[in-house]
Amino acid sequence: MVNLELIEVQEGKAKILIPKAESIYDSPVFYNPRMALNRDIVVVLLNILNPKIVLDALSATGIRGIRFALETPAEEVWLNDISEDAYELMKRNVMLNFDGELRESKGRAILKGEKTIVINHDDANRLMAERHRYFHFIDLDPFGSPMEFLDTALRSAKRRGILGVTATDGAPLCGAHPRACLRKYLAVPLRGELCHEVGTRILVGVIARYAAKYDLGIDVILAYYKDHYFRAFVKLKDGARKGDETLEKLGYIYFDDKTGKFELEQGFLPTRPNAYGPVWLGPLKDEKIVSKMVKEAESLSLARKKQALKLLKMIDQELDIPLFYDTHAIGRRLKIETKKVEEIISALREQGYEATRTHFSPTGIKTSAPYEVFIETIKRI
């Protein structure tokens, strides 16, 4: 931190100092203002779920953990980073937002007041291994893949705790680097118009498989894709039977690139060649919680409130079934000009099918209509 020029920024209720740099990637301590929406969504969620002891495992400037302490009911907030520059900056940023005296010993500084804030200088895996079954909520927001932290996070969270997991390595999850996806996520990705949803379902699926090793199941609270990152919040369920029930929600996708038609197969192993997965085929949201999140977001002072509300409202209204039809991609395949998305949705609903927009694609439609009915509808109207 010696001779480092700092500037102050505000996000939500938090004020923090960040290193002045030409780009965020040149900074010795990483802060990405584009991820403010990501942090808004978790702030909204924690206001509904009320976890008491929370960990921001990869804190950098400390912005996420500081917002947890300022904007949620959490009583004990841990901020951690392996970088010494980050550790020193986190201490300054905590004191910029809270009164009191930091007590420091061996790479750990603690501020006790209305809330307890612990600033930790260590490898995230070592901290989580040390704090076995301790945290009610753990947020993993790494630069790239979260996979090297997932095992220890599952052991560090309470057996009915909550995990928030971000993946920013879109190229593997979207099928541009399929071997990297197979190595990291143990799944075959699907390239093309469905890749954002398939990538999200691969991420949830691998969390489910890792959890099952520890006799844990999962319920998905919310999983979504936004701005080149994949995000999943899951609640852990204790017991081998819960793990077994969770694994039953895994399966595979068969996709015909010539037509845009897809088929789903539930089961731990595929029965046919050219299967994509395994992926999570269960729900991507808890409808009651997401509905509460919309109302909660309206009452909070968020950094990107308009964007947060738009995203949450769309997910709230979205049909929660696997995959969708992309009207532009199918139009190109059929060599026809398709109508506006809303017109197609109305035509499907008039025939008695469920149909909604999807946040995964501005030209996508989720519907209960079979592929043949969907094609007939877009040709007819």
From Swiss-Prot:
Gene3D superfamilies, per database record: N2,N2-dimethylguanosine tRNA methyltransferase, C-terminal domain, Vaccinia Virus protein VP39
Keywords: Methyltransferase, RNA-binding, S-adenosyl-L-methionine, Transferase, tRNA processing, tRNA-binding
EC nos: 2.1.1.216
Binding site for S-adenosyl-L-methionine: 39, 64, 81, 123-124
A GO biological-process term: tRNA N2-guanine methylation
Family as reported in the entry's similarity comment: Belongs to the class I-like SAM-binding methyltransferase superfamily. Trm1 family.
Protein name: tRNA (guanine(26)-N(2))-dimethyltransferase
Taxonomic source organism: Pyrococcus horikoshii (strain ATCC 700860 / DSM 12428 / JCM 9974 / NBRC 100139 / OT-3)
